[in-house]
Amino acid sequence: SPSRGLGDVYKRQIRNYVETIKEGESGYRIYIKDNVPLNRSDREAYDYLGIEPAKVADAKKKKENLDIEIRDFMCKNFYDIRTFGAVMTTFVKDKLNCGQVRGPVQLSFAKSVDPIMPQEVTITRVAITTEADAEKKGTEMGRKYIVPYALYRAEGYVSANLARKTTGFSEEDLELLWQAIMNMFEVDHAAARGKMATRELIVFKHDSELGNAPAYKLFDLVKAERREGVDTPRAYSDYNVSVEEAALPSGVECIRI
């Protein structure tokens, strides 16, 4: 955010974690993957239902529930569709109503609590690509950007109603999501991310399917504030993270993981 100097973080690690932990286990495959054409996964639904891609229109005339059967197949087999939803362009192009699935889980971009100061680091590459390069130069220079320290806050939503009516997202899937959020950086370390980690997960659990309070009111109860005397935060311990649990609405429980 240029105007405030706040940093943003985008999600990808959850899918990577689930794929690593489940390793091809039935029902936990990942739909959105690097360098894998989406229509390859889409065709699996056609194969499962015995439909030739060129004859989808004829199959739809014979099966009134074809859209639902395809959607259910994709949700059952791919964890990220069941969780986050997906836009499956193969089915959209074939004029099927299952091409866009709304997922019960939505996560916002994470934003830094305080302004950040990215630093540019110069690195030296000692390896040479070709023999011709070796004759001309000894090393190559490069740049890398790092953020020495920042505390980020992300907010998310889980719709029990959509989970039940649309994708079949289950309690077991939810537990796996919590596990992924807490541990996703532990299986995918990188020099640029340093010691990046999820420090706490705060969950508001409602006792009704449609919820007992608006999400924004619950998010406002969570505060991340610098401790007294700290001008430049350099560690998680420089912050005090609190939840105003006394102000929780009836039927809402706060779980801190």
Positions of predicted regions on the chain:
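Single conserved hydrophobic/aromatic residue that forms the stacking wall/gate
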Residues: 1-6, 10
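RAMP-family (Cas7-like) RNA-binding scaffold and associated basic/acidic loop-rich RNA-contact surfaces
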Residues: 22-257
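Short active-site loop/helix that positions an aromatic residue
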Residues: 12-20
